[in-house]
Structure formats: structure tokens, C-alpha cells
């Protein structure tokens, strides 16, 4: 595998409340130079929670996604706060979005959702032994919680 491209420069193009668009000037191992844009964030990352109501039922949430301009059914997720472990952030987001906490949390993997243009990482966390507890969240409207059998995931 070749060495990563050499970075000749970085500059901020635009800042928003949550993200920054950054241009990165690169030189590849064959001498080819390109400028790419990427989204950078706080660097804290995010969590994607797999909340298991029982061994065969995952709890999904239906929420509006502005990127797709439609409501989507998916796993609860959110940004990590400062001074918060991955497990603490996952449990907080679970309480805010689903109305449950978890007695058992396990980090399954850490991944990039869009490695071509995003710098932050998402931690996928399995949440088991759920108990009812709701925290106020930052969602603009209540989220619909939808139990889904693992044996029926192919129908999503």
C-alpha cells in the first residue's frame, strides 16, 4: 500500500454551528496534486446505538433527515458531549431518543460513515437490559419508537 498523500495545506472554507468545510491540498505518491473538501467537526465523534428490547427485538426510531428530505427509520444516534465516554453518550442518547436506559453497553466497532469527506468517527454500541428512563433531548419533535424483530430486518 502506498504512503498516504502529502498534505501541502489546509484552509477553512465555511463554518457552521456543528461543522466546518475544509479544503485540503494533497500530493499523491505519483506526483498528482488535488484539492479535496472535507467536513470536520468537534472531533468528539458520535454514537449509533443498537437497543435490544429482547434477544430478537431492536428498537428503531423514525425521524426526519434533512439530507434526504424525508422521514427515515433507523438506529438512535447522536453526537458525543465533552467529558463523556462513549458508553455514557450512548446511554444519554438512548434516554433522549428512545426513553430507555441500558444496564449493559458494549462498543461493537468504530467506523467512518463517509471516509471520503468526513473526519469524525461513529461508535456502534450494543445496548441491552433496557429500563424506562427519559431525558429531554434536542429533537424538534417527538420521535416515533418502532420495535422491529431481527428476523424481519430484511423487510426494512
Regions of interest found by a model, annotated:
Residues 10-48, 53-54:
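Acidic, metal-coordinating catalytic segment for phosphate/diphosphate chemistry
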Residues 39, 43-77:
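A glycine-rich, hydrophobic loop/mini-helix early in the fold
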Residues 45-48, 53, 78-156:
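Unchanged
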Residues 30-35, 70-72, 133-136:
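Short small-residue beta-strand/loop micro-motif enriched in glycine and branched aliphatics
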Amino acid at each position: 500500500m502506498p504512503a498516504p498523500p502529502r498534505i501541502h495545506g489546509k484552509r477553512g472554507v465555511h463554518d457552521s454551528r456543528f461543522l466546518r468545510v475544509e479544503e485540503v491540498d494533497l500530493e499523491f505518491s505519483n506526483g498528482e496534486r488535488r484539492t479535496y473538501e472535507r467536513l470536520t467537526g468537534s472531533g468528539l465523534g458520535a454514537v449509533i446505538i443498537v437497543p435490544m428490547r429482547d434477544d430478537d427485538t431492536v428498537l428503531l426510531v423514525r425521524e426526519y433527515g434533512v439530507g434526504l428530505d424525508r422521514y427515515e427509520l433507523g438506529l438512535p444516534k447522536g453526537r458525543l458531549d465533552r467529558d463523556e465516554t462513549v458508553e455514557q453518550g450512548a446511554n444519554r442518547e438512548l434516554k433522549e431518543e428512545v426513553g430507555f436506559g441500558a444496564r449493559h453497553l458494549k462498543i461493537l466497532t468504530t467506523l467512518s460513515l463517509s471516509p471520503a469527506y468526513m473526519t469524525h468517527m461513529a461508535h456502534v454500541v450494543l445496548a441491552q437490559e433496557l429500563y424506562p428512563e427519559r431525558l429531554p433531548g434536542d429533537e424538534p419533535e417527538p420521535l416515533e419508537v418502532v420495535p422491529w424483530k431481527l428476523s424481519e430486518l430484511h423487510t426494512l
